[in-house]
Swiss-Prot record:
Protein name: Nicotinate-nucleotide--dimethylbenzimidazole phosphoribosyltransferase
Catalytic activities: 5,6-dimethylbenzimidazole + nicotinate beta-D-ribonucleotide = alpha-ribazole 5'-phosphate + nicotinate + H(+)
UniProt KW Oxidoreductase keyword: no
Coiled coil start-end: none
Organism for this UniProt entry: Vibrio campbellii (strain ATCC BAA-1116)
Domain of life per record: Bacteria
CDD domains referenced in this protein's UniProt entry, alphabetically: DMB-PRT_CobT (cd02439)
NCBIfam families found in the cross-reference section: cobT_DBIPRT, PRK00105.1
Enzyme Commission number(s) from the entry: 2.4.2.21
Claim: Nuclease is one of the keywords in the record: no
Amino acid sequence: MDRSFASEIQARIDNKTKPLGALGLLEKVALELALIQSQDKLQSVETIEIRKPTMLVFAGDHGIAKEGVSIAPSAVTQQMVANFLAGGAAINCFCDLNQIDFKVVDCGMLSPIDTLVPDFKHHPNLIERRLGNGTANFAKQTAMSLEQVALGLEYGAKVAQQAILNGSNLLMFGEMGIGNTSSASALLTALSLLEVDHCVGYGTGITQEQLNRKIKLVAQGVNRCHDLDTKGALAQVGGFEIVQMVGAFLEAKRHKTPVLVDGFIVSVAAYVATLLDEETRDYMLFAHNSEENGHKFVLECLQAEPLLDLGLRLGEGTGAALALPLVKAAAQFYNNMASFESAGVTV
């Protein structure tokens, strides 16, 4: 990212009628948004625009779920996607409240949505980009092929591109997939210097006994990732929804479009994207710090300062949807707050 306007933008923020830094993280959000929207321009922007914020929820099933790493069976992935399309989930409530466009992407559930609700086959909020009927059990074998990784990156890029072409200049990603905290934990362990027990958490609310087993299963997958590159690790232990989110992050960067990053699984996808293209980090804002064990560690890897810490552990993109009003507030003060000079305030 071209940061040549950073000092000019910071001066504009500092000259608002407030003590220096008094708006905390909102000032950093305003700086980053203004920098992003100043790319390829001859001068820094005086107004931050937020147009058609769009939530993309990526859904997929995981073979590792057969090992009992979640309190819920894999069938719940499809059931929750049906709930999303019916408008009954938490993410629907928050998107409706904050006027966020909503789409759910079937990246590879065990079965397509119409096998459960035939009328949802052509639902306007459903995008089908299936890579298969769920991944393989990564505790025992490779989760997906390298060809599926490549196709998943392409599919995710196309989903993000379409949202941007439809008028969005701020994306949010969420996820749904029973077993996906195991996949995200394995990826984070394999691609960072972190220990497996730092990256694995309670997910949907498993017992201590289940957690101990989950750590062992994740370690089995991670052990196959030694000496592999990022895409190789994605193939070994990744998820269909995770790889498509990685592709979507990469595409958002190509379009110079910021992404408001949700919780643990989305943050791991963000981290993976930075390993493939470090400049994707310049186009990320971080919504919240969740209760999931590994989230604080991946945020540290990304040198991220999340806006909220509400004890959330739901996923779906809920943290990002809840943080959007703060992002809008950052734009609002940047656009409309008086300067010392215009207000006639002397300090």
